[in-house]
Amino acid sequence: MEELQSFLEKDRSWXQHFLYPLLFQEYIYVFAHDHGLNGSIFYEPVNFLGYDKKSSAVLVKRLIIRMYQQNHLICSFNESNRNRFVGHNYYSYFYSLMISEGVSLIVEIPFSLQLKSSIEEIHNLRSIHSIFPFLEDKLSXLNYLXDILIPHPIHMXILVQILQSRSPDAPSLHFLRLFLHQYHNWNSLITPKKSISVISKENKRLFXXLYNSYISECEFLLVFLRKQSSYLPLTSSGVFLERTYYYGKIQRILVWQNFFQKTLWVFKDPXMHYVRYQGKVILGSKGTNFLMKKWKFYFVNLWQYYFHFWSQPCRIHINQLSNYSFYFLGYFSNVLKNPLSVRNQMLENSFLMDTLTKKFDTLVPVIPLISSLSKAKFCTVSGHPISKPIWTDLSDCDIINRFGRICRNLSHYHSGSSKKQSLYRIKYILRLSCARTLARKHKSTVRIFMQRVSSGLLEEFFTEEERVLSLIFPQTTFFSLRGSQRERIWYLDIIRINDLVTNF
């Protein structure tokens, strides 16, 4: 129990900051505008009403004055609900957007202070591709994989409570709770059907800050339990069970004790690996199916009794890795088994020995990529290329550069695939869509347009990355879509997923 308490204090000591006074400082809203995820929201509404940038600064000062008067602030929220699009009452809606960005920035400050101290040490590991070499080394030795869809709390107040456990700044949290309560009553922040699942574009930053605190709390408890499980051979089960009391409220102690009295001791697993991405979690283990069911049982009860919301067990799928292909960060990944027969010679006798090797394999998901291209209006649902009418107002060079950039980015991101033949079809769709767009702009057919221009017009921008790779590896292999179908390259400069990859 003392060990858990010290673990809690050490992990949460960084949160001893009182940030509420920052809400009444003008420079906070300037920072939120300059560095926010949606920096343009400060000027789009006022420009719509004819205000200039100087007038927006005046509105910030008016907002700070209103924030000193809590009742007036609540009235302004209600007023914005009734008059969002009526004349000059639109400034109330503008106030709500500024508060959302300002609160988001303040909530992010403690997390950014914690992240800044460690980000330089893991600079190379920031690349998305750095995960795949790790999976190549580890997954081939595992037996089971749990695919977990992280549930969302059904109410925003749960996220605020989670944030409260990490920050003693009660005034800021009280203001945030008041803001969310008032904002919940109208549709600009959250739809009335679900209070958290659908967030409008201008409030993604606030939701992301609250959601990250929730994920951080989940992983904090998981890391603690994982660390303690390694000491189980040296600790009696009775003493270890006392530590689970901290996971729930006082009234939940007996429930938690009954749930975990016969399960915690089987959590010993020296080869468990955890990867989180896009609201999902991959939990790999070298243990048995029974052990994975115990972890599933733990997650379901963690969400129910610690975070106080129900999570369906069907959100956690346990699969045997040798018979399972999973979608992960734009790839279909699986573990291939390759049986080998080796002839051994001992003196005058020889015999055959059968061995089994495992290899982590990554494939390009063609059908989902075509679906993404279809949603982006580059082709039909069946993969037939079509023109991009909204780009016909651009110059020919801009059109070619846009199509070429998309193709190069997809090739760059999927360079780790062992079978790149699938990219030929994606390249064909983008190339023909580019030709159709140019032909439409010049009011011609694709055949006539291609006869007029040089044959290398559409070939140049697709081969730029291949030329770069040939300079990096001049004496080894010629890396291209044709010459490196089985060569896998993982880059350290990919810090985000291509939009087309995440569009399905």
Swiss-Prot record:
The keyword Chloroplast applies. Signal peptide: none annotated. Keywords: Chloroplast, mRNA processing, Plastid, RNA-binding, tRNA processing. GO terms for molecular function: RNA binding. Its main location: plastid. It holds the Pfam family MatK_N. Usually encoded in the trnK tRNA gene intron. Probably assists in splicing its own and other chloroplast group II introns. Belongs to the intron maturase 2 family. MatK subfamily. This is Maturase K. The lineage of its organism: Eukaryota, Viridiplantae, Streptophyta, Embryophyta, Tracheophyta.
